[in-house]
Amino acid sequence: MKEGNVVQHHGLYRSEFEHDNCGIGAIVNIKGQKSHDTVANALKIVENLEHRAGKDAEGKTGDGVGILLQVSHRFFSKVCKPLGIFLGSERDYGVGMFFFPQDELKRNQAKKIFEVIVKNEGMNFLGWREVPVKADVLGSRAVECMPCIMQGFIERPKKVKQGLDFDRRLYVVRRVFEQSSDDTYVASLSSRTIVYKGMFLVKQLRMFFEDLQNPDYESAIAVVHSRFS
C-alpha cells in the first residue's frame, strides 16, 4: 500500500525511488543471553509490518511471514524426550524444518529418503517430531495448500566439530535430499538456527506455531520477514 503524503525532495531523498517492498526486522541480545522475550518481541515487530506484507483479495492469506531463531536446547530437549528422541548436549544435534506433502504415502517415502541420505553421509538420524499448529487461524487458500510440517533431528558425529563444521555436513544432506525429493520443502537444517514460516498474515505467525508461544523457547537472536510480492 502507498501513503498519500510523500515528501517529494528533502536532502538526498528522491520520491521517484520510493516503492513497496518486503518488511524485515531483527533483535539481538549483545551479551548472547537467550530468553523468550527475544522471540516475543520479534513477533511484535513482524506484527507491526502489515504495511510491508502482501495478502490475497480476501485479506485472509498472506504472501508469507517467517522468523529465524537460534535452536533452543531447553525447548527441544523437553518436547523431544516424550517422543523417545534423546538429543544429548546443546549443538550436538541438528534440526530440520520440513514441509512434507499431506499424502501419507508420499510423505513416508520422502522421510525414508531423508533418513537414508543421513546414514549415507555417516550420521545418525534421531527421529521425527510433528510440529503442533493451529490451522483454523489460516485463510482458505493457505489451508488448501498447507503441508504436513515436521522436524527431523540428526546427531552430530563425534569426529565432526560443533558449529560451522557440523552445519556444513548438514548442508550437504539438505542439498542431496532436495535433489531427491520434489514434494518436500526444507525451510532450514542446522545445529544453530531454525526457521518457522508460512503463507501467513503478519498476526498469524504467532498463533499458528504453538512452539513460538512456549515460554521455554529461548533465543538470543531473532530475524523476521514479511513478504510483499
Regions found by a protein language model. Give the residues of each.
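N-terminal segments that mediate ammonia production and transfer
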Residues: 1-229
